[in-house]
């Protein structure tokens, strides 16, 4: 049995108006396995304010930890995860 490759989707955070979050972006946020966020607290707040629910694992990803997080995220993608 072959495993399918994961998917990486980049979603911009709406600034100033939560209504700017597209339905497609909302769908991806809900079905992701992992949410790699610059600030996980703000992402959780965004999801709460928009009423979105997710079972995704929240992981920080920013300038200070990118070097160590990239291999972990690539491994997750190779194992079929949606990030």
Predicted regions and their residues:
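Short glycine-cluster motifs
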Residues: 78-83
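Glycine-rich, highly charged phosphate/nucleotide-binding loops
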Residues: 65-73
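Glycine-rich, flexible N-terminal cofactor/catalytic loop recognition
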Residues: 1-64
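CheY-like receiver
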Residues: 28, 72-76
């Amino acid at each position: 049995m072959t495993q399918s490759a994961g998917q990486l989707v980049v979603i911009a955070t709406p600034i100033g108006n939560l209504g700017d979050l597209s339905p497609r972006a909302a769908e991806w946020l809900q079905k992701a396995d992992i949410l790699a966020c610059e600030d996980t607290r703000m992402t959780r707040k965004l999801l709460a304010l928009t009423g979105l629910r997710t079972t995704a694992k929240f992981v920080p990803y920013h300038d200070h930890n990118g070097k160590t997080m990239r291999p972990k995220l690539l491994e997750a993608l190779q194992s079929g995860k949606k990030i």
